[in-house]
Amino acid sequence: MQIILLEKIGGLGNLGDIVTVKNGYARNFLIPAGKAKRATEANMKEFEARRAELEAKQAEILADARVRQEKLDGQTVTVAQKAGVDGRLFGSVTNADIAAAIVAAGIEAVKANVRLPNGPLKAVGEYEVEVALHTDAVAKITVAVVAATE
């Protein structure tokens, strides 16, 4: 299915690009989320009429993400979790735990933005984690996992 992208989508294209995607991806995700429209003549004309408005909106979203990225870059977030004497955790630290710690530090974050390339953290220590605030604004933070004291 041919669609017009209404915002930049990683791995797919930029605002205004006409791309071909699978029907299910377009119908079930991109179009309902407001990220794309079908590439019909009427929609193309409507998009061209609203292009400046959409570009300004995307620039504002990116600027907000860059401000949050500057606040987050290089920060250390501490997460306390029960651990054994050998340093292994009872359970694990997930992206939801890290997002909650970032929010507790006063910066807006969602668990879907936290990237853990090797899966959940399962041992005490310090880990480098990426927080994708936007496709063009990715902050690198240090997560210090410590043993919880009771």
Swiss-Prot record:
SUPFAM superfamilies: L9 N-domain-like (SSF55658), Ribosomal protein L9 C-domain (SSF55653). Keywords: Ribonucleoprotein, Ribosomal protein, RNA-binding, rRNA-binding. One of its GO terms (molecular function) is structural constituent of ribosome. One of its GO terms (cellular component) is cytosolic large ribosomal subunit. GO terms for biological process: translation. The keyword ATP-binding does not apply. InterPro entries: Ribosomal_bL9 (IPR000244), Ribosomal_bL9/RNase_H1_N (IPR009027), Ribosomal_bL9_bac/chp (IPR020594), Ribosomal_bL9_C (IPR020069), Ribosomal_bL9_C_sf (IPR036791), Ribosomal_bL9_N (IPR020070), Ribosomal_bL9_N_sf (IPR036935). Disulfide bonds: none annotated. Gene3D superfamilies: Ribosomal protein L9, C-terminal domain (3.10.430.100), Ribosomal protein L9, N-terminal domain (3.40.5.10). Binds to the 23S rRNA. Belongs to the bacterial ribosomal protein bL9 family. PANTHER family: 50S RIBOSOMAL PROTEIN L9 (PTHR21368). This is Large ribosomal subunit protein bL9. The gene is rplI.
